[in-house]
C-alpha cells in the first residue's frame, strides 16, 4: 500500500502537469491576495489576517483537485494496467486508500507554499505578529479537510471512466454542487423548516465554521463521513468490473 502511495505521488510530481497545477494554484492565490484590487486583497483588507486565503481557496480547489485526481484510476483503465493493479496482493479498499492519501498529500504540498503568505503577514503586520495564529492554524485544518473531501470525489469520478477529461469535468460538477448547491437551494427558501437541514448537507456551511478557526466535532464527523461515502462509491465502482 505504501509503495502504491509513493508511486502516485512520484508519478504526479514527475509530470509537467503536476508542477503546472501547483504553480497555477499559487499564482492565482498570489494575484488575488496581493495584486488584484478585489475583496480578497490582503493589503486592502485592512488588518493582518489570512481570512482572504481561506475564503478564496475552495474556489481554486474546485479546479485544482480534479486536475490532481483525474488520472488516478482513469489512466490505469485507459492503459489497461487497472487489471494488473487489482490483482496485486492488496484489497480494493487498500488501493483506494493509497490513492486517496496520495491525493491528500499532494493537496498539502500545494498548500505548504502559502505559509509564505502567513510569514509575510506575521512579519509586516502592525505591530509585528499581530495575527491570530490559533485561528489561522485551525483554518488550515479546515482547508485540509475540505481538500480531502474534494479528493474523495475526484477519486470516484476517475474510477467510473477511462477518459481523464471526463473525470475532470465530472469532479468539478460534483464538487461545485457539493460546495455551493445546497447553499443555493437553502437561499431560495423553498422548503420551510427543512431548509436549514438542506444547508447542513453542503460542504460550505461546515467549511465556513472551520475556516474561522472553529474546530467543531460535528464538522469533523461530517467531513469524515463525506469522504467515506465517496470512498465506498469508488470501491463499488471498482468491484463492478469483476461482475
What are these regions (language model features)?
Residues 36-48, 167-237, 243:
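Terminal transmembrane helical anchor/hairpin motif
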Residues 30-34, 47-60, 98, 102-162:
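Secretory targeting signals
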Residues 1-20:
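Aromatic- and glycine-rich beta-strand/loop motifs that create alpha-glucan
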Residues 16, 22-27, 95, 103-111, ...:
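Hydrophobic alpha-helical membrane-insertion segments
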Residues 53-75:
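Long, hydrophobic alpha-helical segments
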Residues 72-102:
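Helix-loop-helix units of permease transmembrane domains in multi-pass membrane transporters
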Residues 65-69, 117, 153, 233-234:
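Hydrophobic/aromatic residues in alpha-helical transmembrane segments
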Residues 8, 116-120, 152-156, 176, ...:
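Alpha-helical transmembrane segments of multipass membrane proteins
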